[in-house]
Amino acid sequence: MVVQASKQKAKTLKNSAIDVVLEWFKTKQWDPFPFQKKTWSAHAKGESGLIHAPTGTGKTYAAWAGPLIEWMDELGNKPMPKRPPELRVLWITPLRALVKDTTHSLRTLVEDLQLPWTVEERTGDTTGSIKAKQRKRFPSCLVTTPESLSLLLSYPETKEAFSNLRTVVVDEWHELLSTKRGV
């Protein structure tokens, strides 16, 4: 998994936001692995990197919690907004089935923390009406395939929508290396 973070507002983790995520882990009866905490800290500093860990060890939450912590830190003591943030995270994965699984995992954390974020998928299977809706108002996090992203990049409104993008995650990147799809 490759994670590219924005260096726009590099900073360190604030206790309150990280504590919210750590508490969520406790409710699941999980302990975050050191690599997850290290990933969150690196994200807070605006660093990019590669997450390499065995299947089932929490790479998704390692990459996902960083942008959420960053957003909660930015929010500070302000009241929770009712409207979701604009597109901040682009999550690219090569397999449609993985798009569904990833979207479910990302939504779980957002819903459990009661954050106003929207997490949506966009693949060749996504209906035209949903794609049209997304082009008018992108979700906070878009989970997509390389092919759907290529098409999306051809639309003029995408440049504006991507202007607030803070994090790009390329999941299962090794699946793309030996194909025409590329990374």
Positions of PLM-derived features:
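N-terminal intrinsically disordered, low-complexity tails of helicases
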Residues: 1-38
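Conserved P-loop/Walker A NTP-binding site and adjacent catalytic elements of P-loop NTPases
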Residues: 22, 30-183
